[in-house]
Amino acid sequence: MLPKIGILCAGDDELAPFLPLLDRRSVRRQAMLTIHEGWISSVPAAALYSGVCKVNAAIAAQVLIDSCRVEAIINAGTAGGIDPSISIFDTVISTETAYHDVAEDILTEFHPWMDSIWFPGDPFLLSLATQAAQDSGRPVRFGRMVTGEAFLSGPGTEAVRSAFHPLCADMESAAVAHVCHANGIPFLSIRTITDSADRSAAARA
């Protein structure tokens, strides 16, 4: 049997497009989460939405690993563009992910004792995503993502752009990557841009 894939979204609207793809779907509840399990083509999968923010995403990721026995997690949803070259409706796929609101030594001097603040995307999942992006004909970018507990705007956006040079920002990806790293589980985040740095700048002008 092929490895079981976990699909984790922040909101029910982000999860909704995946549910019709699940054949022989079953539904159960755990930790106040609704878990959908079935098969996408011949691949076993479990899908859920966590609710917004880092802790909710981390809880959901651990449930997927412990209860659903997934062997990889894909975090899917929306994000805000940070790099000025990013446009609304572009898709961004994470090559690496970090928190923009956590002190660096929290991750390097304490558990999980990382070499840097960046959680890398899984190479095999990235190779599959690269091929899918080429086949899609849609605007897809690969690069850094950052995660924090609040929406960014104005000076906050500029500070994050200068410090981390990400393509986009969200409120869950790094937390899911963190849990996957601690459990030795492959991870990838795929985000569609719903707001861009250029649009935010225009609104402030």
Locations of the language-model features?
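Regulatory input/activation interfaces that engage signals or partners
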Residues: F187, I193-A205
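Proline-aspartate-enriched helix->loop->beta-strand connector
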Residues: V70-I74
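N-terminal short beta-loop-beta anion/metal-coordinating cradle
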Residues: M1-Q62, C68
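Short glycine-rich, acidic/polar surface loops and turns
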Residues: E172-L188
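Mid-sequence, gly/pro-rich, charge-dense loop/helix-turn segments that line enzyme active sites
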Residues: I82-F164
